[in-house]
Regions:
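Charged, amphipathic alpha-helical linker segments immediately N-terminal to NTP-binding catalytic cores
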Residues: 3-57
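Conserved ASCE/P-loop NTPase catalytic core
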Residues: 36-171
Length: 171
């Protein structure tokens, strides 16, 4: 994949201020628990996946986790990682797929088709045009959700690439 333009969620200005004000008014006297239940109830209606609120909540917490946090005067990494474990056909992939679609931020890939180069990127040479960087999914999903379905099938090299990128914040 070659990205010519990347739009980050915080730079998008597609919010309707009137709708935000309506939500603010609606939530004014609600507790955090009531607000969260309203969000999860509406996600169940949107996704048509019932009984997987725990997965939706984990995905939302991961997406809205701050990228960096100032702690004791130092900037610390703050991005979140979530793993969904469970039996097959229990709604894990479909829940995150619907969440990614709703937030319009991220992608779901399968471990069978993932490679270290596909996750991080590679330098590619094109004859007579020089070199360019072919960015992988980790870079393309910066500040978005990247879900790897069947992550237990990733090779050790892929896990190493993911672990190093997660540890350092650099691909």
């Amino acid at each position: 994949l070659l990205a010519y333009e990347i739009e980050f969620p915080e730079e998008a200005h597609a919010f309707d201020p009137e709708k935000i004000l309506k939500l603010k008014t609606k939530f004014k006297d609600w507790s955090i628990k009531e607000r969260l239940n309203w969000i999860l109830d509406n996600f169940e209606k949107y996704s048509q996946i019932v009984g997987r609120r725990n997965l939706a909540l984990a995905g939302l917490l991961c997406f809205f986790t701050p990228t960096w946090v100032k702690f004791n005067g130092e900037m610390q990494r703050g991005w979140g990682n979530v793993i969904f474990c469970g039996d097959t056909t229990t709604g894990k992939s479909e829940t995150i797929r619907k969440l990614i679609r709703l937030l319009n931020a991220g992608m779901l890939i399968t471990a069978e088709t993932a490679s270290a180069v596909g996750l991080t990127g590679a330098a590619t040479q094109v004859s007579k045009e020089g070199w360019f960087v072919d960015w992988g999914f980790l870079v393309l999903c910066d500040r978005k959700l990247l879900a790897v379905d069947g992550a237990h099938k990733l090779s050790l090299a892929n896990w190493a690439a993911l672990a190093e990128a997660e540890r350092s914040g650099v691909v």
